Amino acid sequence: MRRLLTSSLPAAYFAYSHRVAAFSNNLPPLTAVRRLTMTSTSEDLVDVDCNLLHNDLISMMDISSLDFDDIQAPLKILHHPSTRSIKAVISPSSSIEESEQTLSLLQNCTSRERNHMRIKTTVGVHPYSSEEEALTPENLDKLRSMLNDSNNNEIISCIGETGLDYSEGFPDKQYQLKWFKSQLDLAFEFGLPIFLHERLAFEDTLKCIDEAVERHEGQASPKIIVHCYTGTFLECIEYMNRGYYLSVSGFILKKGDDADEVRKCLREGIIPLERLMIETDAPYMGFAGNKDSFFEAEGDSFASLPSKKRKRLKSQYPNTPSSLQLVLEATCNQLNIGLNERCEEMISLDQLAASTTQAATDFFRL
């Protein structure tokens, strides 16, 4: 996740919004979510997007009183007590350099350093890097070299993070389109799933995918996960009709119409549970209270910090993997609002945890 601009809601939404307002008041209060944390799930969770190499995430461990000096810096956060419910992590790459760095990290770390978690990465170029990382034969060969290296077979899960993002501040779409099309071809070439980033570019994204399918007629189409979904209800329906997977993040704990579109997708039950996953997108996609369990685990160490520093650290950014439990609970809340309205059997936190973990295990070959 890089940047996000709001988009308008379809007119049909407002009738729906009026109907559910009395029940959900647009956003379930965070206090209601926190009540669920008193009995957290007994199931293991998978964070399908945690940017372990991001400096702002790594720096969160600078305040920790816990001794992890013998652990490589990007992996220290996985040893924090607040991540104890996580069993596996996908740490996606956004550039050729980051792809190389993450592969090197994961090839050379021990199971103990990983805190016995299963960690995989992706190989690719993010839309944000599409101009800086020029599409040249040499750069494509670098990606192919990583993908052909047998030492990476158990580490690389997908091609990506790739896609299109027409938000303000992103490179011109001419750069994005070239890289996206080339990476779609790589997915067909190597038989790997696609880790898709799409913001405000729904139609062009589908057009590129459809054209790739035509170019590779007769080949099996790669599986696709639309990560950190922030699109509309109608767009989600189309993604689901195509059989894509989808992950939700702390975006559903934010206020606003855009976030309610995603909550509506959950309430209306249009995402099959076997294709629904959860993520933090840390250090991005923070929300109010997202680091509470992190600070609680630090105890007196955090309390002893100067008040200004505590206040700054309690801001929504940077997000940490510790918020995954809250994302799970908020997802469960929204699903159950819809199930209750339809007089259907509601889903427990453990059931949803098991379902999202199974979906991630199947998709990423964990």
Question: Whereabouts are the PLM-identified features?
Answer:
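Mid-domain alpha/beta scaffold segments of enzyme catalytic cores
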Residues: 4-5, 9, 16, 23-366
